Regions:
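Aromatic-rich peripheral "rim/lid" segments of glycoside hydrolase catalytic domains that contact
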Residues: 2-44, 52-61, 85, 98-100
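Active-site mouth loops of central-metabolism enzymes
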Residues: 40-52, 115-123
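Substrate-binding cleft and catalytic face of glycoside hydrolase catalytic domains
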Residues: 58-138
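Active-site beta-loop-alpha junctions enriched in small/polar residues
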Residues: 2-3, 46-49, 74, 104-106
Length: 138
C-alpha cells in the first residue's frame, strides 16, 4: 500500500519513473530489459505538480529510446496557483514524444465527494477543462 503525500492527485507518486528508477535516481534491474523493447513499446509516466524530477525523467526516457508516452494533466492541479505555467513546462518537455494525454483527478471542491476519484458535480466543468487542455496542447 502506498501512502498518499497529497489528498489530490497522489497517485502520481506511485507511477514515478515507470518503476525503473529508484527514488535515489539509481536504475533498477528492469531498466536494461525495458530498453530492449523501445521504441516499439511505449510507457506510462506521470509527473506530479511542479515535479522537480521532470528534467531527469525526460532525460531517462530519451536515453531509453522511448517514443510513445502516456501521461496526464490533473484537473485538480488546474485549480492550483501557476497551474498553466506548470502544464506548459511539462508539455514543452514532452514535445519530442508521441504523447497520449489523459485528464484525471477531480478537485475536492468539484466532486460529489471531497476526493480526487469522485465524479464531478458538474461534468460540463470537467469537459471544459479537457477542451481547454486540448486546445492549448494539440
Amino acid at each position: 500500500t502506498t501512502r498518499h503525500r497529497e489528498a489530490e492527485g497522489s497517485s502520481y507518486y506511485r507511477h514515478y519513473y515507470m518503476g525503473l528508477i529508484r527514488a535515489d535516481g539509481q536504475p533498477k534491474r528492469a531498466l536494461s530489459k525495458f530498453a530492449q523493447y523501445t521504441p516499439e513499446l511505449g510507457i506510462c509516466q506521470w509527473f506530479h505538480f511542479e515535479d522537480p524530477r521532470l528534467d531527469d525523467g525526460v532525460a531517462w526516457l530519451k536515453r531509453l529510446g522511448v517514443k510513445h508516452l502516456r501521461t496526464g494533466l490533473s484537473w485538480a492541479d488546474s485549480h492550483r496557483e501557476h497551474a498553466d505555467a506548470w502544464f506548459d513546462r511539462q508539455m514543452k518537455a514532452l514535445e519530442n514524444f508521441d504523447v497520449t494525454l489523459t485528464f484525471c483527478f477531480t478537485p475536492e471542491s468539484c466532486g460529489k465527494r471531497p476526493h480526487h476519484t469522485s465524479p464531478p458535480h458538474c461534468p460540463e466543468q470537467f469537459a471544459e477543462f479537457c477542451a481547454r487542455m486540448v486546445q492549448r496542447y494539440a
